[in-house]
Amino acid sequence: MPDFSEKGWLADIALRYELKRGKTCLTEKRHLGPLMVQRPFYPEQGVAHTYLLHPPGGVVGGDTLSININVQPYAHALLTTPGATKFYRSAGGTASQTQTLTVAQEGFLEWLPQENIFFPDAQVCLTTHIHLASSAKFIGWEMQCFGRPVLNEWFETGKVKGRLNFYVDERLILTESMRVEGLQKQAAAMREFPMFGSLYIYPATDALKEIIQHHLEKVNPLVEYGLTDVDGILVLRVLGTQTEPMMACFAQVWQIVRQHWLGYCPEPPRIWAT
């Protein structure tokens, strides 16, 4: 794979969702550079499904991406991506992606991107800020794949740094950091799994945690997992060797949460099957 110069894309997108006559509408869309979205569609009544697109197909050293999602009171938006986000090798520059997700009172955001894939020699900095009103609902995940294990290509060199801050009513509830510098140095921490993921659910309840735990024990997914309640946020952490079992695990939990909160089980976005 060729090297890329340190001069990269500058991409910024800001989306605002509001409830209008019983339907969530994308009322504001601003974008700079190659980040963009398709028009929302409505496979479920009133819920705005949106695909977030990055046309060049991948991210290289020097690229700077900023994603801002704002869900207003009582609005309900679901965002996903049509495929994995690929972070390619760097010739020296760092690829940076910052995500800010904000949900107002009684709003509901489902942030369900497909996995990030970090190629060997990638230099990446990821930052996620989640700001929720206490009466909001949120389910979202991040899946990280280091190298391309299906091709026996491992992330032996490179650096990925990440930070997630989770606020409720502007109070910092949860902060997490990630630092991976080649899997040779990280093998003990990740137990030699090339993939890990985190799924966040707010608000947490004992009943919901019990339902999810029972499901995970029953289906015995092909992943290693742990489920914890962190000050009212349910966090499901997963280690795996392939994308499909991890995605299946998260998608099933997402359906369980939807059933518990809204009384019906949604169909997965069709784009996940392509």
Curated annotation (Swiss-Prot):
Instruction: Write down the InterPro entries for this protein, in alphabetical order.
Output: UreD
Similarity annotation: Belongs to the UreD family.
Q: Name one GO molecular function term.
A: nickel cation binding
Disulfide bond annotation, renumbered to this chain: none
Protein name, per record? Urease accessory protein UreD
Compartment(s) of residence = Cytoplasm
Describe its assembly.
Answer: UreD, UreF and UreG form a complex that acts as a GTP-hydrolysis-dependent molecular chaperone, activating the urease apoprotein by helping to assemble the nickel containing metallocenter of UreC. The UreE protein probably delivers the nickel.
What's this chain's function?
Required for maturation of urease via the functional incorporation of the urease nickel metallocenter.
What span is annotated as the signal peptide, if there is one?
none
- Extract the HAMAP family matched here: UreD (MF_01384)
Lineage of the species this protein comes from: Bacteria, Pseudomonadati, Pseudomonadota, Gammaproteobacteria, Enterobacterales
What are the inducing conditions?
A: By urea.
Provide GO CC annotations from the record.
cytoplasm
The record's listing under Pfam families reads: UreD
Which key words are in the record? Chaperone, Cytoplasm, Nickel insertion
